[in-house]
Amino acid sequence: MINQANKTAKLRVKRAVRVRKHLRGTGLKPRLCVVKSNSHIQAQLIDDETGTTLGGTATFAKEYRNTEFCKKNKASARKLGEQIAEIAKSKNIKEVVFDRGPFKYHGILAELANAARAGGLQF
């Protein structure tokens, strides 16, 4: 049982590395990194050249506590996509590199990406 968990974790890291080795965020075109846990979603704009986070939001943020958007579902992903697009606009960012990590571009990730595109981000 433990060996299976270790194998799954290693495969997940391997997928993330495989995706991220092709992605590089800059100040003009940062990386939009999306992380999913068992209960939350998190999105960040990252400048890899300087190693800084330009902005981010998550379902566990104060503004989403005790609301319908504090859980990991498509409605929350849509709200986070809109929020991250607003953050990017405030920083004069129009283009990003989408980093899905080890996750498939499906369901919650696709919903977040579509909402970010609807908010004005291009990727």
Curated annotation (Swiss-Prot):
Biological process terms in GO annotation: translation
Gene Ontology CC terms, in alphabetical order: cytosolic large ribosomal subunit
SUPFAM superfamilies: Translational machinery components
Cited NCBIfam families: L18_bact
HAMAP family for this protein: Ribosomal_uL18_B (MF_01337_B)
Function of the molecule: This is one of the proteins that bind and probably mediate the attachment of the 5S RNA into the large ribosomal subunit, where it forms part of the central protuberance.
PANTHER family: 39S RIBOSOMAL PROTEIN L18, MITOCHONDRIAL, LARGE RIBOSOMAL SUBUNIT PROTEIN UL18M
Assigned protein family: Belongs to the universal ribosomal protein uL18 family.
Oligomeric form and interacting partners: Part of the 50S ribosomal subunit; part of the 5S rRNA/L5/L18/L25 subcomplex. Contacts the 5S and 23S rRNAs.
Protein name per the record: Large ribosomal subunit protein uL18
UniProt lineage: Bacteria, Pseudomonadati, Chlamydiota, Chlamydiia, Parachlamydiales
